[in-house]
Amino acid sequence: MAREFSLEKTRNIGIMAHIDAGKTTTTERILFYTGRIHKIGETHEGASQMDWMEQEQERGITITSAATTAQWKGYRVNIIDTPGHVDFTVEVERSLRVLDGAVAVLDAQSGVEPQTETVWRQATTYGVPRIVFVNKMDKIGADFLYSVGTLRDRLQANAHAIQLPIGAEDNFEGIIDLVENVAYFYEDDLGTRSDAKEIPEEYKEQAEELRNSLIEAVCELDEELMDKYLEGEEITIDELKAGIRKGTLNVEFYPVLVGSAFKNKGVQLVLDAVLDYLPAPTDVAAIKGTRPDTNEEIERHSSDEEPFSALAFKVMTDPYVGKLTFFRVYSGTLDSGSYVKNSTKGKRERVGRILQMHANSREEISTVYAGDIAAAVGLKDTTTGDTLCDEKDLVILESMEFPEPVIDVAIEPKSKADQDKMGIALAKLAEEDPTFRTQTNPETGQTIISGMGELHLDIIVDRMKREFKVEANVGAPQVAYRETFRTGAKVEGKFVRQSGGRGQFGHVWIEFEPNEEGAGFEFENAIVGGVVPREYIPAVQAGLEDALENGVLAGFPLIDIKAKLFDGSYHDVDSNEMAFKVAASMALKNAVSKCNPVLLEPIMKVEVVIPEEYMGDIMGDITSRRGRVEGMEARGNAQVVRAMVPLAEMFGYATALRSNTQGRGTFTMHMDHYEEVPKSVAEEIIKKNKGE
């Protein structure tokens, strides 16, 4: 099968935005106008084409980026719908990695919102060219020029309007195209017919003013145009378009469009702008990779002639075809039924079938070409971020980096039948999502799941129930405390049972001392003259090790202590290993009153990134969580606060930070060291654990 669309006529785009800016509705309309959907689905009725997981329809938010193929004016447009919620930023990063360009959707009433900042920063990191669509122009309080202003003020983006709305709120009737210098009025409800007319008299002056500032901004990025402009020559429409395209592709300029996806106005013009201003795979720099054997850097150009290379950016379990691996082809071609090498894992994989996805239906294709996005069926070992390549010409494309999970919750199956299913379900979910981890706590035997936030874990538990039919109880998050001794002492442990017949006799003297942090348990045998026979020494050590596991204060493991066995006595008949084991554990219990045992807690290294104006609130909040601020620095237009905070105080922090900063703050944390718990807090924990 020959290539249907040339590389120059291919666009891989993402649609990114804050929650509820109208991203899914915009995607819907794009699919409607490109002829892939017959009936328009409304998100607020829970019937959208792109949001196809049940919980997405219920919550009205988009979680998985469904990759969809559409056609417009002889071009192929691959669209990746991305989530706009903080807990799902990994999905966004994942999509941005494989896109060539993006449409940022703003709400005309609010302009740039908190999550827009986060997603915008991520897009800048990956160097993704963007056009901006100011949506919801029909909403009360909609203000187009205010929204354009927020792009400049809050994101320092060189953004300029290339359109102007005619009217606003209920009177939003049409759109003025500042590049072509015409006005579009919509004739029917579905917005399929719009006629280009002359700009209405009352808008002429404003339109001319905005068009002139647009031309100036474009000329500043292009010397030839600047010279022409300064000499007073007219800039033609084609030159203006070429200038906007050049600035956009260099990520130096952001054209801003306007409309209302819900009212079917302006979406076709967004599609035209995608073709006019966003890059084809050939406009993007060649992707860099390394040879697995020599680590030498190599490039793969976007061409069918080059060896095959692709990046897997999403793994999903589909109820009908099993495991689907979404991938972006960077170079070469791939036929279904052929073999490829997963160079990241060093495994050979067979591509059973190749599907091109349309929101929730699929079409089987025989070949994918450079620049395409498709899903493969039949890959066994491939996970998110892996490179797939030609077996004869290996390359590892730079992978994606995923943040560490920040929240842990204990989970247990409701019944025995759920137990086995739960293990399988968790393993499959962890395979799909690199920011979700699962482990079994060896001390409590609980299954612990970890993720990026409370909503993230809620949805995981919800998916277990719906997709895998597993019912589970979710506990409150737990902290792994430890215990240790602060002072040393010599203690006796004596176990004697002699009441006729064979008795029990074990007697030891042990000196306990605190050990260095992280050094663990050390046992020393200092018996002289056989007062405790050699064969009983290992029993003394084993008795201590068992007793340490259960602690002395609140049942948490006792760590970092030294024990020296220096004296004791035995009985010819009644002594045995068991008796010495018990004697050793009694010695440890007797040490409680003399060795000043304390409780230790994990201390997390926390880094919070926030806009300057929230600095005071955040510092106060960290202090109230028993945290110590270690340092601060400016990073771009944000502030970074570094602090040490006990894990026990960090539960619910993601939610608190979100509300303290209107969602504009982000944080990362990882375990740093153990530290003594303050007395008042320790007493509470001990009481709770002893069930008092």
Curated annotation (Swiss-Prot):
SMART domains: EFG_C (SM00838), EFG_IV (SM00889). SUPFAM superfamilies: EF-G C-terminal domain-like, P-loop containing nucleoside triphosphate hydrolases, Ribosomal protein S5 domain 2-like, Translation proteins. GO terms for biological process: ribosome disassembly. It is found in: Cytoplasm. GO terms for cellular component: cytoplasm. The modification Phosphoserine is found at residues 213, 302, 569, 680. InterPro entries: EFG_II (IPR041095), EFG_III (IPR009022), EFG_III/V (IPR035647), EFG_IV (IPR047872), EFG_V (IPR035649), EFG_V-like (IPR000640), EFTu-like_2 (IPR004161), G_TR_CS (IPR031157). Residues 8-282 form the tr-type G domain. Keywords: Cytoplasm, Elongation factor, GTP-binding, Nucleotide-binding, Phosphoprotein, Protein biosynthesis. Catalyzes the GTP-dependent ribosomal translocation step during translation elongation. During this step, the ribosome changes from the pre-translocational (PRE) to the post-translocational (POST) state as the newly formed A-site-bound peptidyl-tRNA and P-site-bound deacylated tRNA move to the P and E sites, respectively. Catalyzes the coordinated movement of the two tRNA molecules, the mRNA and conformational changes in the ribosome. Belongs to the TRAFAC class translation factor GTPase superfamily. Classic translation factor GTPase family. EF-G/EF-2 subfamily. This is Elongation factor G. It comes from Bacillus subtilis (strain 168).
